[in-house]
């Protein structure tokens, strides 16, 4: 006495579809655990992330000429007059 279970082709396709989604979800979760969910390879060592306190401050220094030099000829297109001396400016960031 043999017993055969007949499965409708639509039901079989649905079972295969659900099983494939479950397998893809398991592969994703396993890879997320292995790769620390940040895309970093666990077999490589990474430098620790720098904090804001450990970074050095950046100092910007802007130099302006106080007197126009002879290498800048004044032509008819340059009618700026006599610019006031600007000096040295610095900005601490």
UniProtKB/Swiss-Prot annotation:
Principal localization reads membrane
Which GO cellular component does the record give, naming just one? membrane
* Bilayer disposition of the protein: Single-pass membrane protein
Which UniProt keyword terms apply here?
Membrane, Transmembrane, Transmembrane helix
Q: Where are the transmembrane segments?
A: 14-34
Compartments where located: Membrane
Protein name per UniProt: Small integral membrane protein 36
Q: Which domain of life is it from?
A: Eukaryota
Q: Does the keyword Hydrolase apply?
A: no
Claim: Transmembrane is one of the keywords in the record: yes
Region annotation Disordered: residue ranges?
A: 73-93
């Amino acid at each position: 006495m043999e017993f055969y279970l007949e499965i409708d082709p639509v039901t079989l396709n649905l079972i295969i579809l659900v099983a494939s989604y479950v397998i893809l979800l398991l592969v994703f979760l396993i890879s997320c655990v292995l790769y620390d969910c940040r895309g970093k390879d666990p077999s490589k060592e990474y430098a620790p992330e720098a904090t804001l306190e450990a970074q050095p401050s950046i100092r910007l220094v802007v130099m302006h000429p106080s007197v126009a030099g002879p290498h800048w000829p004044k032509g008819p297109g340059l009618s700026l007059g006599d610019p006031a001396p600007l000096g040295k400016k610095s900005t601490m960031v």
